[in-house]
């Protein structure tokens, strides 16, 4: 991890934090090889970045004296609509999009998403939060994305999505579209990305009826996690 993240439950007082998570304690020892007196990059979830001096480290936890005096990186102005990936891909995808700066993510059901994916233990709040935090630690960011789940396509696209599009450019990435994905946008974007195999024609039509512009990344068919990274890097 490139950043040690604390939350308010870790706070001892105005300047001291107590890290108790066994996984991160092991990381401190084995990867950072941290010893008392070392200074490391730290942040407060939902707050500022800064540095922390390790005061003590034992089996019960690590105590840091912290100074939080820097803003986190600017978020991407994007609402990502992503067809729910396969469970083994979901963890990596959550980490990648968080590291890239996505702050609004909707995971939705589409025709080619297997219904069993929605019963995956990877969708528990604890698992999702764990992977979001790993993404923040990678990118040295502190603000968790908002993640919503839409297990029914039609009610979402008819009843909830239209109100979320005001003032935003809407794009749907899908193979075979006529327009190349634009570059370097400086406006809010809603970006829809389908599952492995893409959206079915009915789904594309429903997005286009709401004003979504169809875009592509070229002739190559990419895995979803690769396409997400490539699209976000190109758009912003």
Give the residues covered by each predicted segment.
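N-terminal positively charged helical leader segments and presequences
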Residues: 1-70
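Short, ordered loop/turn segments at secondary-structure junctions
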Residues: 9, 69, 109-113, 219-220
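Hydrophobic side chains in well-ordered alpha-helices
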Residues: 28, 90-93, 203
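Short secondary-structure boundary segments
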Residues: 44, 109-110, 174-177, 195, ...
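RNA substrate-binding interface of SAM-dependent RNA methyltransferases
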Residues: 71-169
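Active-site/ligand-binding-proximal alpha/beta "capping" segment
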Residues: 164-204, 212-215
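Structured adenosyl-cofactor binding patch, chiefly the S-adenosyl-L-methionine
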Residues: 201-236
């Amino acid at each position: 991890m490139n950043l040690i993240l604390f939350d308010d439950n870790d706070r001892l007082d105005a300047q001291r934090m107590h890290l108790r998570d066994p996984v991160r304690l092991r990381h401190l020892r084995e990867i950072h090889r941290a010893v008392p007196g070392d200074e490391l990059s730290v942040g407060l979830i939902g707050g500022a970045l800064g540095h922390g001096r390790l005061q003590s480290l034992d089996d019960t936890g690590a105590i840091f004296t912290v100074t939080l005096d820097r803003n986190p990186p600017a978020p991407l102005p994007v609402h990502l609509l992503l067809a729910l990936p396969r469970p083994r891909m979901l963890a990596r995808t959550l980490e990648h999009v968080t590291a890239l700066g996505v702050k609004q993510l909707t995971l939705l059901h589409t025709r080619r998403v297997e219904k069993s994916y929605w019963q995956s233990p990877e969708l528990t709040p604890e698992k999702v939060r764990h992977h979001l935090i790993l993404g923040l630690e990678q990118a040295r960011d502190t603000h968790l994305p908002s993640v919503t789940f839409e297990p029914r396509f039609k009610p979402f696209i008819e009843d909830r999505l239209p109100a979320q599009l005001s003032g935003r450019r809407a794009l749907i990435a899908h193979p075979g579209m006529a327009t190349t994905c634009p570059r370097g946008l400086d406006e809010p974007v809603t970006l829809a990305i389908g599952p492995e195999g893409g959206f079915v024609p009915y789904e594309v039509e429903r997005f286009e009826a709401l004003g979504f512009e169809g875009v592509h990344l070229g002739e190559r068919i990419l895995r979803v996690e690769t396409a997400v990274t490539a699209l976000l890097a190109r758009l912003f």
